[in-house]
UniProtKB/Swiss-Prot annotation:
<comment type="function">
    <text>Assembles around the rod to form the L-ring and probably protects the motor/basal body from shearing forces during rotation.</text>
</comment>
<comment type="similarity">
    <text>Belongs to the FlgI family.</text>
</comment>
<protein>
    <recommendedName>
        <fullName>Flagellar P-ring protein</fullName>
    </recommendedName>
</protein>
<dbReference type="InterPro" id="IPR001782">
    <property type="entry name" value="Flag_FlgI"/>
</dbReference>
<dbReference type="GO" id="GO:0030288">
    <property type="term" value="C:outer membrane-bounded periplasmic space"/>
</dbReference>
<dbReference type="GO" id="GO:0009428">
    <property type="term" value="C:bacterial-type flagellum basal body, distal rod, P ring"/>
</dbReference>
<keyword id="KW-0732">Signal</keyword>
<comment type="subunit">
    <text>The basal body constitutes a major portion of the flagellar organelle and consists of four rings (L,P,S, and M) mounted on a central rod.</text>
</comment>
<dbReference type="Pfam" id="PF02119">
    <property type="entry name" value="FlgI"/>
</dbReference>
<keyword id="KW-0574">Periplasm</keyword>
<feature type="signal peptide">
    <location>
        <begin position="1"/>
        <end position="28"/>
    </location>
</feature>
<keyword id="KW-0975">Bacterial flagellum</keyword>
<dbReference type="GO" id="GO:0071973">
    <property type="term" value="P:bacterial-type flagellum-dependent cell motility"/>
</dbReference>
<dbReference type="GO" id="GO:0005198">
    <property type="term" value="F:structural molecule activity"/>
</dbReference>
Length: 370
């Protein structure tokens, strides 16, 4: 890599970081983007089943639970088999998962995900047999069945193998039919609960004020930092859909504490708009020490009584980049970026600088390393 290329990449990374950190007016979002109404949520369903029709890529005999499942299934159909003679190479035991919305009614269809449970190498071309889908209460809420759709393939021979994506997980769009609805009488509620995704008092109170302004009274109140209770106005009792539609689209401007998030594995740094730094002097330089061993070999002449002698020789070179001492007083993020650019800091250098600023008490933000 040439010097010009290194400089260009460093400049491009710092320019991108500067653009991301530019101060900008806070943007309004809808309430439904930062909160959810209590009770209006999906319910997870899970089931155990068999996928058949695999071309020799199914489970091996070591997957004893697959053989037991085959024996039980055939026994229910009135077919007696010797389990010692069953070879499940065309069958795979799978776990089937899906999420059922609270609004789902009998006859509704759900997309399902099918994942191999045993040692099958591929589910390509398989068909899921009828599988009961149960909730956490042990009741059956849906039945799943159908051919799998995979987003990859796998092929191998004696000396080579080709694979794209994962072939042991597949999906069946609309593969489950709802047989039982979740008991939930939506329109009979006289009180609603709003769960905030943003843990911030200012944002929660802003939501309360917006709700009360829209409903024309003190119907909403904050229970805690992340919960808002809403008393249903008399005009909407028994018909909550119009009320919910109007409330969830109200605009608010979320607030959040100053935070800097650092991903050391990738060198990614995300700085919030509220981050400030006190007046501080920053200098950042790299000290590079290279130790190289060059042993010297003394070889005597042929047929001489001398012995070969190896003399160790170590060369040590130290090189340190000269960086300027920069005084930064970060009233804004742009000043922080400009100051770091002036000392030639790369995004990975920024991680070390931010850690040091936090230790010195000059960074007024929460520093989170992931």
């Amino acid at each position: 890599m040439t010097f010009f290329t290194r400089c260009f990449r460093r400049g491009a990374l710092l320019f991108l970081l500067a653009v991301l950190l530019l101060p900008s007016p806070a943007q309004a979002v809808r309430i439904k983007d930062i909160a959810s109404f209590g009770g209006v949520r999906d319910n997870d369903l899970m089931g155990y089943g068999l996928v058949v029709g695999l071309g020799g890529t199914g489970d091996k005999k070591s997957s004893t639970f697959t053989i037991s499942s085959m024996v039980n299934m055939l026994d229910k159909m009135g077919i007696a088999v010797d389990r010692t003679k069953l070879t499940p190479k065309n069958v795979a035991a799978v776990m089937v998962t899906t999420r059922m919305p609270v609004s789902a009614r009998p006859g509704s269809r759900l997309d399902i995900t099918v994942s191999s449970l045993g040692d099958a190498t591929s589910l390509l071309g398989g068909v899921l047999l009828m599988t009961p889908m149960k909730g956490v209460d042990g009741k059956v809420y849906a039945l799943a069945q159908g051919p799998l759709a995979l987003g990859g393939f796998s092929a191998e021979g004696d000396a080579a193998r080709a694979q794209k994506n994962i072939t042991t997980v597949g999906r069946i769009p609309g593969g489950a039919v709802v047989e039982r609805a979740v008991p939930f009488e939506f329109n009979t509620q006289n009180k609603l609960t709003l769960h905030m995704n943003v843990q911030d008092f200012s944002t929660t109170m802003q939501v309360v004020d917006r709700l009360n302004d829209n409903m024309g009274g003190q119907f909403a109140s904050a229970r805690d930092i992340a919960t808002v209770d809403i008393m249903v106005p008399p005009a909407y009792r028994g018909n909550l859909v119009p009320l919910m539609a109007s409330l969830e689209n109200l605009p608010v401007t979320p607030d959040s504490p100053a935070r800097v998030v650092v991903d050391e594995k990738t060198g990614t740094v995300v700085v919030g708009n509220s981050v400030r730094i006190s007046k501080v002097a920053v200098s950042h330089g790299n000290l590079q020490i290279v130790v190289q061993e060059n042993p010297q070999v003394s070889q005597p002449g042929a047929f001489s009584p001398g012995q070969t002698v190896v003399t160790p020789q170590t060369d040590i070179a130290a090189q340190e980049e000269n960086r300027r001492l920069v005084m930064m007083e970060g009233a804004t993020l742009q000043e922080l970026v400009d100051g770091l650019n002036s000392i030639g800091a790369t995004p990975r250098d920024l991680i070390s600088i931010l850690r040091t600023l936090k230790a010195a008490g000059a960074l007024h933000a929460e520093l989170e390393v992931i």
